[in-house]
Amino acid sequence: MAKRVQVVLNEDIKSLGNDGDLVEVAPGFARNFLLPNKKALPVTPTVLKQVEHRRAKQAEKEAAKKQEAIDFQTALTTIGRFTVKKQVGEDGVLFGTVTNGDVAEVVKEATKKDIDRRDISIPEIHGVGKYKVQIKLHNEVNAEINLEVTSY
């Protein structure tokens, strides 16, 4: 009897691997848990071809997303400066703060493209002036924009 069997995972399993990974597991684990619950498939030449095809499609999608992020990064740097208007006191200190949501809204107005506010990293802004803001567009692509805070 085989000590280990190979299976291809259909979904991410924390202790084993990710969707599409070829892993070796105990025969009982495969027979009693993975295969009946459709979490894995036994390894056959057909299944291996399907996995390779799925990986190729996923790599194409990832490359397209990365290229889109690079294009958007170029667009952001072309625009140059984004302006946020806030209420300011007599001493030049802001009432409230400039939030990630404010920056996302300004970028959306200028580019017509939504950015998740959680992907924006801003320094603490307490007054009017110019600041550098980091935006994560993709796992490998970041953009730095110039943000100007003015009073209205």
Curated annotation (Swiss-Prot):
One of its GO terms (cellular component) is ribonucleoprotein complex. InterPro entries: Ribosomal_bL9, Ribosomal_bL9/RNase_H1_N, Ribosomal_bL9_bac/chp, Ribosomal_bL9_C, Ribosomal_bL9_C_sf, Ribosomal_bL9_N, Ribosomal_bL9_N_sf. Keywords: Ribonucleoprotein, Ribosomal protein, RNA-binding, rRNA-binding. GO terms for biological process: translation. It comes from the Bacteria. Pfam families: Ribosomal_L9_C, Ribosomal_L9_N. One of its GO terms (molecular function) is structural constituent of ribosome. Gene3D superfamilies: Ribosomal protein L9, C-terminal domain, Ribosomal protein L9, N-terminal domain. PANTHER family: 50S RIBOSOMAL PROTEIN L9. Belongs to the bacterial ribosomal protein bL9 family. Binds to the 23S rRNA. This is Large ribosomal subunit protein bL9. It comes from Prochlorococcus marinus (strain NATL2A). The gene is rplI.
